[in-house]
From Swiss-Prot:
Membrane-side (Periplasmic) residue stretches: 1-15, 160-170
Organism of this sequence: Escherichia coli (strain K12)
UniProt keyword Membrane, yes or no: yes
Quaternary structure annotation from Swiss-Prot or TrEMBL: The Tol-Pal system is composed of five core proteins: the inner membrane proteins TolA, TolQ and TolR, the periplasmic protein TolB and the outer membrane protein Pal. They form a network linking the inner and outer membranes and the peptidoglycan layer. TolQ interacts with the N-terminal domain of TolA and with TolR.
The UniProt record lists the keyword Cell membrane: yes
Cross-referenced Pfam families: MotA_ExbB
Gene: tolQ
Predominant location category: membrane
Family: Belongs to the ExbB/TolQ family.
Transmembrane segments: 16-36, 139-159, 171-191
Reported consequences of knocking out the gene: Mutants lacking the tol-pal cluster suffer delayed outer membrane invagination and contain large outer membrane blebs at constriction sites and cell poles. Tol-pal mutants fail to complete division and form cell chains, and fail to process denuded peptidoglycans at the septum.
GO-annotated biological processes: bacteriocin transport; cell division; cell septum assembly; protein import; regulation of membrane invagination
Subcellular localization(s) per the UniProt record: Cell inner membrane
Protein name per the record: Tol-Pal system protein TolQ
Length: 230
């Protein structure tokens, strides 16, 4: 027993316990791939949001900023995508010249809200999987452990004289399943909470930007309306 390592325990485990271990290892690999990918995407989203908002508040004209965004409209993300969607709808409704200022601003705000929801949906891709892994992996591992221990005691019942050396390898094989389940679950739960926290922070950032931009469009719409009346 002292010479056994984890690989030996895996190879000597029953077929079902081996299958459970492989499933949990697969969950762990998939979780780490998602953690790395989502972390990179959220880091990029935070940088892009900060860079665009710095540019937005630099005093640049909205029409010029819109033209710049229009030139790369297929690659827009985050705050810039929200801005582009809102200003595009604002310009379209304003040119129609058949809508009250309130309707123009409301239409632009609605377009920005839809765009923001799409951005958040993209940011949240695959994150729920981490929550699922964190929830079910310990139970899958526990099932493997229970099955392995049961299998070990059944085998033990077939011998006349039972000793600790006979049952210990079987129990150790079974407990490996629980260990792998925890190994898969703990990072997944921690990453799930952390990534959701970052998505919520970006959502608040987008929402604040949208409210501020809506206020600017509101002033602009009523200014143009008053000048047309005059």
């Amino acid at each position: 027993m002292t010479d056994m390592n984890i690989l030996d325990l895996f190879l000597k485990a029953s077929l079902l316990v081996k299958l459970i271990m492989l499933i949990l290892i697969g969950f762990s690999i998939a979780s780490w791939a998602i953690i790395i990918q989502r972390t990179r995407i959220l880091n990029a989203a935070a940088r892009e949001a900060e860079a665009f908002e710095d540019k937005f508040w630099s005093g640049i004209e909205l029409s010029r900023l819109y033209q710049e965004s229009q030139g790369k409209r297929d690659n827009l993300t985050g705050s810039e995508q929200i801005f582009y969607s809102g200003f595009k709808e604002f310009v379209r409704l304003h040119r129609a010249n058949s809508h009250a200022p309130e309707a123009v601003v409301e239409g632009a705000s609605r377009a920005m809200r839809i765009s923001m929801n799409r951005e958040l949906e993209n940011l949240e891709t695959h994150i729920p999987f981490l929550g699922t892994v964190g929830s079910i992996s310990p139970y899958i591992g526990l099932f493997g452990t229970v099955w392995g221990i049961m299998h070990a005691f059944i085998a033990l019942g077939a011998v006349k004289q039972a000793t600790l050396q006979m049952v210990a390898p079987g129990i150790a094989e079974a407990l490996i399943a629980t260990a792998i389940g925890l190994f898969a679950a703990i990072p997944a739960v921690m990453a799930y909470n952390r990534l959701n926290q970052r998505v919520n922070k970006l959502e608040l950032n987008y929402d604040n930007f949208m409210e501020e931009f809506t206020a600017i469009l509101h002033r602009q719409a009523f200014t143009v309306s008053e000048s047309n009346k005059g």
